[in-house]
Amino acid sequence: MNNWNSITIKISREAGEAISALLIEAGSAGVEINDSADYLNHEDQFGEVLPEIEQSDFVEITAYYPENMPIVELKAEIEHKIANLSDYFSLTGLSVTTNNLSETNWAEAWKKYFEPARITHDLTIVPSWTEDYVATGSEKLIRLDPGMAFGTGTHPTTKMSLYALEQVLRGGETLLDVGTGSGVLSVAASYLGAAEIFAYDIDEVAVRVALENIELNPGHEKIHVSANNLLEGIDKKADVIVANILADILVLMTEDAFRLVKEEGYLIMSGIIADKADMVIASAEKAGFFLETRMIQGEWNCLIFKKTENREGVIGG
């Protein structure tokens, strides 16, 4: 019998991915995210009976830690780190609670909740331990270990990023993946024909996770992963830059992105809550980009900008 402590955080949905990363960094063996939007936005394709869920602006994130870790001190440390993030998102309604539980082989049992998920017409995310799933037709399998960090790749912001990559990649491109997290976007770009991919993350844990996930997939030799703060100090010119991170962070990189994107190239920005989309658009347009496509799923936005002198077909052009 394995004993575990859990820390559950209730916080605004916008902060969910950042808090998940923080909990993993603090040593969590796994993170569970309970989000009502996952049910409300779910497309019933297989006759599933889903529970009645009331819309909420909050998510509950539960992280699991071995019992021998000092949970009281750990809770205090996590609360301190969350407080330091108040400049980036609202902490209104925040709650942090702890619990003790016993579970036989918990580290394996949680895996039953993650199943293969068809994300786009051609891309399906498959847990690394699912060996019997066979691709059909043009389907390409992205293998991930979602227990390592950063979820399963099925969040609306990730889905829209994948759709955006399908829209702009034609083959042979150089791509920069900023805030790579699980590495899912880099793997997808490889499948979609990008010739050279550079993935960056400021978090060393994310760099390790991305490397491990990328190596689960074919074509990993053309993906280069390293620690870096956004695009600071990067000189590599790219046909496409993609970033799925917080809106307040995205606006810090628009000028560097414009410097690095080749003429007629694209900047894909996702992870944007609806009420901050205009802020991101203004920042990118000020840098010199034109908004070409705006995708919306629920309260999330994904924006595709183009660096071009020809405004025909561009929003506002």
Swiss-Prot record:
Superkingdom assignment: Bacteria
GO biological process: methylation
Biological source species: Lactococcus lactis subsp. lactis (strain IL1403) (Streptococcus lactis)
Catalytic activity line of the entry: L-lysyl-[protein] + 3 S-adenosyl-L-methionine = N(6),N(6),N(6)-trimethyl-L-lysyl-[protein] + 3 S-adenosyl-L-homocysteine + 3 H(+)
GO cellular component, as recorded: cytoplasm
Compartments where located: Cytoplasm
Matching PANTHER family: ELECTRON TRANSFER FLAVOPROTEIN BETA SUBUNIT LYSINE METHYLTRANSFERASE
Chain residues that bind S-adenosyl-L-methionine: 158, 179, 201, 244
Gene Ontology MF: a single term: protein-lysine N-methyltransferase activity
InterPro entries referenced in this protein's UniProt entry, alphabetically: Ribosomal_L11_MeTrfase_PrmA, Ribosomal_PrmA_MeTrfase, SAM-dependent_MTases_sf
Enzyme Commission (EC) number: 2.1.1.-
Regions annotated as coiled coil: none
Pfam families assigned: PrmA
First-tier enzyme category under EC: transferase
Stated role: Methylates ribosomal protein L11.
Keywords annotated in UniProt: Cytoplasm, Methyltransferase, S-adenosyl-L-methionine, Transferase
Designated name of the protein: Ribosomal protein L11 methyltransferase
Major site of localization recorded for this protein: cytoplasm
Gene3D superfamilies in the cross-refs: Vaccinia Virus protein VP39 (3.40.50.150)
Entry similarity comment: Belongs to the methyltransferase superfamily. PrmA family.
